[in-house]
């Protein structure tokens, strides 16, 4: 046997010996597992209350807030709607929504995080008035992180603006695969 083969044989035999003496526990748990449970619970609670939660995502500057203002003004006399604005630190969009529509609009500061998860969404919902028909979560402007975290929303939507380029579905496939609706803006 070659010297290197002897070393490999020795190490393999040693590993087998220790494997018999040491109990090995394989832990294969998704880091998203707990959030998934929380999101499912939140969806069930919202369904009981008759609240439809929409998670709106896109990159910064695609027109989320402007589109929301136009949509809210078209529906606010028919249903009770409120908005949760998520941003790393700013409250500009929450103020803009409130001033332009007159509806309830709250700001969720993520403290540097580029997404919201189910627990963060719940905190926002707990601060909205009762009796809503529609709660809209305007997620942090980003095409990567928000797609990875289930917020507990009934539906996910995104806005894609034409100036961003035609390659976004290729660069960010997860975002496009989890969305129920994609709005094309700035055509």
Each model region followed by its residue ranges:
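Conserved beta-strand/loop subsegment of P-loop NTPase cores
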Residues: 82, 157-158, 176-187
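Short, conserved loop/helix-junction motifs that constitute active-site signature segments
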Residues: 151-152, 174-178
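The Walker A (P-loop) glycine that initiates the GxxxxGKT/S ATP-binding motif of P-loop NTPases
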Residues: 58
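Cofactor-binding loop segments of dinucleotide-utilizing enzymes, especially the Rossmann-like FAD-
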Residues: 86, 110, 161-162, 186
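Nucleotide-state-sensitive switch-loop elements of NTP-binding domains
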Residues: 21-44, 49-54, 62, 66, ...
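Short, acidic/small-residue loops that bind anionic groups at enzyme active sites
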Residues: 83, 158-170
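Short, positively charged and aromatic/hydrophobic N-terminal segments
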Residues: 3-10, 15
């Amino acid at each position: 046997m070659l010297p290197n083969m002897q070393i490999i044989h020795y190490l393999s035999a040693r590993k087998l010996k220790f494997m018999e003496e040491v109990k090995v526990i394989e832990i294969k748990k998704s880091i998203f597992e707990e959030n998934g449970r929380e999101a499912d619970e939140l969806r069930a609670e919202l369904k009981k209350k008759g609240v439809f939660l929409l998670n709106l995502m896109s990159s910064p500057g695609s027109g989320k807030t402007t589109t929301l203002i136009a949509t809210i003004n078209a529906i606010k006399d028919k249903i009770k709607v409120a908005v949760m604005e998520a941003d790393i630190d700013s409250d500009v969009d929450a103020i803009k929504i409130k001033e332009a529509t007159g509806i309830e609009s709250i700001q969720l500061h993520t403290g540097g995080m580029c997404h919201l998860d189910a627990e963060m969404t719940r905190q926002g919902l707990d601060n909205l008035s009762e009796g809503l028909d529609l709660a809209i979560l305007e997620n942090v402007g980003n095409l990567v992180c928000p797609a990875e975290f289930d917020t507990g929303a009934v539906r996910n939507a995104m806005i894609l603006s034409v100036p961003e380029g035609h390659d976004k579905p290729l660069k960010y496939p997860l975002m496009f695969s989890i969305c129920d609706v994609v709005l094309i803006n700035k055509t």
